[in-house]
C-alpha cells in the first residue's frame, strides 16, 4: 500500500482544458511512490503511467454521487438558484451562483468520500485537476507537507471576507481518528443535505469544508499551509493567492 495517494476528478471539458496536462505533469515530476486515483466523468484521459495513476469511471465508481445528482438535479437551490430563499436571495452576492451550486461541486467531494472509504493509503490528498506540477516533487518534500501528528492539512485564507479554505489541495491522515470523524461528518452534510449543506449560508465545497473545520477547532491537529503568509485582513488575507504564494507554490 502506498503511503500517500492523491485523488482528483474532472469531466470532459475539464480533461480538454487542464486535466490531461495535470496528469502528464504529475507522472513526469512527482515521485513514483506517490500514487493517484482519478475519477473521470464521462471522458477517457490518456494514462501517462498506469503504475502510478489509476483511472476510474465516475459513473461506475461513485454510486453515491449519482444518487445525489439524481435526488437534487431538478431542485433550483441545488443548482445555484436561491431566488426562492427569502433570506439568501437578498444577499448582495446572490448572483454568484457558484456559491450555491451543490451539484457542480458534488463531483469533488464524492470523489474524496469514495477514496476515503477505500482506504488506499495512510494519507489521502485532494488536488484540483486544474493544477500543474512545474517542478520535480520528491517523496520527502511531499511527505514533509503531511506531518503524522496532524489529522488534516489545508490552505487557509486568513481573516478576510473569503474565510473558507482554498480547497485546491488538502491532506487527510487516515491513521488519525479525528480525520475519520471529520470526513464522516463532511459526507453526512451531503447525504442528509436538507439538514446539512442546505442549512448553511453557502453550499459550495470549500464553504462546507470550512464549516466542518470550525467545529473541530477545539482539537489540536490541523495544519494551515498559509497561516504565516497573512499580513493584514483582506480578501486574500493580505499575502496574495494562498496556493501560489505558500509552500505549495514551489512545485
Q: Regions from the language model: what does each represent?
A:
Residues 1-94, 117-121, 174, 247-251:
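N-terminal anchoring/stem segment of glycosyltransferases
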Residues 13-17, 102-106, 200-203:
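Conserved phosphate-coordination/catalytic loops
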Residues 20, 106-110, 203-211:
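A structural signal for well-ordered alpha-helical segments within the folded catalytic domains
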Residues 90-99, 195:
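Short glycine/proline- and acidic residue-enriched helix-loop micro-motifs
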Residues 100, 104-154:
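GT-A fold catalytic core of metal-dependent nucleotide-sugar glycosyltransferases
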Residues 108, 127, 165-168, 205:
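Residues that flank catalytic or metal-binding motifs in active/ligand-binding sites
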Residues 134-202:
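Conserved catalytic core of nucleotide-sugar-dependent glycosyltransferases
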Residues 172-251:
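Catalytic core and acceptor-binding pocket of nucleotide-sugar-dependent glycosyltransferases
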Amino acid at each position: 500500500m502506498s503511503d500517500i495517494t492523491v485523488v482528483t476528478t474532472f469531466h470532459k471539458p475539464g480533461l480538454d482544458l487542464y486535466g490531461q496536462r495535470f496528469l502528464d505533469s504529475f507522472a513526469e515530476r512527482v515521485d513514483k511512490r506517490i500514487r493517484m486515483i482519478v475519477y473521470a466523468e464521462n471522458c477517457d484521459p490518456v494514462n501517462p503511467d498506469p503504475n502510478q495513476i489509476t483511472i476510474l469511471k465516475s459513473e461506475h465508481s461513485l454510486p453515491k454521487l449519482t444518487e445525489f445528482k439524481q435526488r437534487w438535479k431538478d431542485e433550483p437551490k441545488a443548482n445555484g438558484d436561491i431566488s426562492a430563499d427569502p433570506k439568501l436571495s437578498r444577499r448582495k452576492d446572490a448572483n454568484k451562483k457558484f456559491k450555491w451550486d451543490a451539484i457542480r461541486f458534488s463531483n469533488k467531494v464524492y470523489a474524496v468520500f469514495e477514496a476515503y472509504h477505500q482506504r488506499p493509503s495512510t494519507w489521502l490528498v485532494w488536488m484540483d485537476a486544474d493544477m500543474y506540477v512545474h517542478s520535480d516533487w520528491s517523496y520527502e518534500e511531499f511527505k514533509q507537507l503531511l506531518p503524522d501528528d496532524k489529522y488534516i492539512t489545508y490552505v487557509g485564507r486568513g481573516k478576510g471576507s473569503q474565510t473558507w479554505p482554498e480547497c485546491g489541495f488538502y491532506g487527510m491522515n487516515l491513521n488519525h481518528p479525528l480525520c475519520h470523524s471529520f470526513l464522516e461528518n463532511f459526507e453526512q452534510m451531503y447525504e442528509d443535505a436538507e439538514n446539512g449543506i442546505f442549512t448553511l449560508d453557502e453550499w459550495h465545497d470549500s464553504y462546507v469544508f470550512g464549516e466542518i473545520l470550525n467545529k473541530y477547532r477545539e482539537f489540536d491537529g490541523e495544519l494551515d499551509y498559509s497561516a504565516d503568509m497573512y499580513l493584514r485582513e483582506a480578501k486574500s488575507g493580505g499575502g496574495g493567492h494562498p496556493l501560489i504564494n505558500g509552500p505549495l507554490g514551489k512545485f
